[in-house]
Amino acid sequence: MSKVAIYPGTFDPITNGHVDLVDRALNIFDRIVVAVSTAYGKKTLFDLDTRELMIKEVFKDNDRVKVVSFEGLLVDTAVKHGACAIVRGLRAVSDFDYEFQMSSMNNKLNSDIQTIFLTPSEKFSCISSTLVRAVAIHNYQRVGEFVPECVFDRIELKYSKD
């Protein structure tokens, strides 16, 4: 039986840090389901379908990665896709409090699904989707080193019109 983990997020947009985390999680798990959240209450740069399409493009050559969108409870989506674990990244101590609370709630909802925390590779430790969006607003051309090429192309299309 293969070990499957789910990696949830808004991914608005997916960054090289996210991609690195998936690649590293594949050293632990046989398959990773990247689960793109509907982002309740957040104003997103890209709509759900576009975010899902970009991530599928990023991982198109990796048959060990499946990309899905979801709404509702993460643990229900994890069960639906046969995941035994939730993978989350911790960039800084400030991430821990929120992630610990989420992990505790997910464990209460389904104690069969474990949460695994991975720290980013050092070169990706300061990258976040929020920071990429903030930089892109002022100078989209500066975000190319932080996101996959297909994502940069979408950012360029969005901001070069302005």
UniProtKB/Swiss-Prot annotation:
Query: Where does it localize?
Result: Cytoplasm
Q: Name one GO biological process term.
A: coenzyme A biosynthetic process
Primary location group: cytoplasm
Binding-site positions, substrate: 10, 42, 74, 88
User: What GO terms fall under cellular component here?
Assistant: cytoplasm
Question: GO molecular-function annotation terms?
Answer: ATP binding; pantetheine-phosphate adenylyltransferase activity
Pathway named in the protein's UniProt entry: Cofactor biosynthesis; coenzyme A biosynthesis; CoA from (R)-pantothenate: step 4/5
Query: InterPro entries recorded for this chain?
Result: Cyt_trans-like (IPR004821), PPAT (IPR001980), Rossmann-like_a/b/a_fold (IPR014729)
Could you give the subunit structure recorded for this chain?
Answer: Homohexamer.
HAMAP family for this protein: PPAT_bact
* Family the UniProt entry places it in: Belongs to the bacterial CoaD family.
Protein name, entry field? Phosphopantetheine adenylyltransferase
Name the gene behind this protein.
coaD
